[in-house]
């Protein structure tokens, strides 16, 4: 495995360069949003954005139905990762340099992750790290059935997400009736472990959360999200994908909510973001 110096952030620099080229080529469509947190919520553990649809071309956004990762657009290409994965830009980024790690051949998004996936994630993270998230199926917020992981780069010392403190304190949370706690498992995480250890740890957490086991189940028996940082990992068991006009993927549980013209703002203001998340587990 190629070991990269984290301080170099070669993948991140390539992502920024390809972002510039892709925007010039009109191959990238950054989603324009406005932060409206203060209008709806008083705390700082969520960031609420409203999607600006004034330049939102639905035909372009949803595009053709063929697999966009097979083949992927060459102008979005960042680097090859091992023998089985490719690093590319997200065509519809939520932040600058929004990175996707995809399998270079078809693998289902809703299947069990394997050791090669964890080896590839680890290789990228040794160079460029941040908030990783994975959505296992449409119910968990996945937009494509081809296996892909997403990375939002974070600088050294930067908080990974608004809900980080909540995740770190979840295991000491005393409310045994908490619907979120019953459907989320969180643990300390060490990216320096051997990839086989990361893979086995993932399977262990899935089993504890009631997602099944690859020995007896062909695929996880519930949709789920994964959040990964340099310090912790969380897996969220999912039940719904669209409620009160909101669609939630892994980023929603990390504390990033997106409001669209269909979202029930009054519900969000009355009950708050955490109550909204409970509807999705």
Model-derived regions, located:
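Histidine-centered divalent-metal-coordination microenvironment in nucleic-acid enzymes
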Residues: 103, 137-161
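Intrinsically disordered, low-complexity linker/loop segments enriched in Gly/Pro
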Residues: 105-127
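Catalytic micro-motifs at enzyme active sites that drive phosphoryl/nucleotidyl and oxygen chemistry
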Residues: 86-91, 121, 132-141
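A short glycine-rich, hydrophobically flanked beta-strand micro-motif that places a catalytic Asp/Glu
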Residues: 130-143, 147, 214-229
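Generic beta-strand structural signal
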Residues: 83-85, 97-98, 128-134, 145-149
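Hydrophobic/aromatic-lined pockets within catalytic cores
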Residues: 126-129, 154
